[in-house]
């Protein structure tokens, strides 16, 4: 906090990971809280966040052009996703955790339109999405970054933070057209961790149509997907990752 005070900012922008520091930061300068709302959707949250910032700095036209570009790119990806099933998950500590459409990587099922089979199997244990205000309103204590991993090996439970650990037998039984994999250990720089490809390409996963058809997708920039989604630059990178595989 001392370093922030020394900068003497006129305004402070924070995301969900700093929501617990809202009060302390607000004593230094007005705080604008910018996070994502899973009920609204990642893309609309990004657009709203960008418009909030643009309104402060008079950059509305630039943001309008960027959001229009995102819409066109998403429409193209939706055509690729139409009629295809998928599982979306992250590898961490040698296991594979399924993600629903309620948190990280939710753009794949919600906006791009893949039929995320994990979304059908998870139990939404939270009543609503993560908080987003795009204003000086204090965020709720319950954000997507505050919740821990739940699950019993079947991929069931709230998936908003780290997903739910699923056995590889569960993945085989679901047999999706695509499997999207985000490497959490790479995203956070875990030393000595298994790479996502080493975890996923085992004898069981090799039985899936996704493996046989070359449709296991390893998201190229896991650090962005895991820690940075919610901004214009991050969304641009995420769409590029999907475009590189699907087009």
Predicted stretch roles:
Residues 9-12, 35-40, 51-61, 94-95, ...:
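Second-shell loop/turn segments in exported
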Residues 17-21, 46-49, 62-66, 73, ...:
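Stable alpha-helical elements in mature extracytoplasmic
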Residues 2-8, 166-175:
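Short helices/loops that flank or line small-molecule/ion binding pockets
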Residues 62-143, 147-156:
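Basic- and aromatic-lined ligand-binding clefts that recognize polyanionic substrates
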Residues 11-15, 32-33, 86-89, 178-182, ...:
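Structural recognition of the beta-strand scaffold that forms the well-ordered cores
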Residues 1-56, 188, 244:
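Acidic/His-rich segments in extracytoplasmic proteins that coordinate ligands and/or metal ions
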Residues 44-48, 55, 64, 177-247:
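Structured C-terminal subdomain patch of bacterial secreted/periplasmic proteins
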Residues 20, 34-52, 85-107, 127, ...:
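Extracytoplasmic ligand-binding site segments that recognize negatively charged/polar headgroups
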């Amino acid at each position: 906090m001392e370093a922030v005070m020394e900068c003497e900012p006129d305004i402070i922008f924070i995301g969900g990971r700093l929501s617990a520091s809202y009060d302390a930061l607000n004593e230094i300068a007005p705080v604008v809280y910018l996070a994502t709302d899973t009920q609204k959707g990642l893309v609309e949250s990004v657009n709203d966040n960008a418009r909030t910032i643009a309104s402060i700095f008079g950059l509305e036209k630039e943001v309008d052009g960027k959001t229009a570009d995102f819409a066109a790119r998403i429409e193209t990806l939706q055509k690729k996703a139409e009629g295809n099933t998928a599982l979306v998950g992250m590898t961490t500590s040698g296991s594979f955790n399924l993600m629903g459409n309620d948190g990280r990587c939710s753009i794949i099922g919600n906006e791009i339109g893949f039929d995320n089979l994990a979304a059908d199997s998870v139990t939404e244990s939270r009543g609503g999405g993560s908080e987003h205000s795009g204003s000086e309103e204090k965020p709720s204590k319950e954000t997507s970054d505050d919740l821990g991993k739940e699950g019993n090996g079947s991929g069931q439970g709230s998936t908003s933070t780290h997903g739910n650990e699923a056995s590889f037998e569960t993945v085989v039984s679901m047999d999706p057209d695509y499997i999207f994999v985000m490497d959490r250990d790479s995203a956070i720089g875990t030393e000595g961790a298994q790479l996502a490809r080493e975890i996923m390409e085992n004898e069981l996963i090799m039985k899936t149509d996704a493996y046989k058809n070359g449709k296991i997708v390893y998201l190229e920039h896991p650090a962005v997907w895991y820690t940075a989604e919610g901004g214009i630059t991050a969304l641009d990178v995420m769409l590029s990752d999907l475009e590189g595989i699907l087009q």
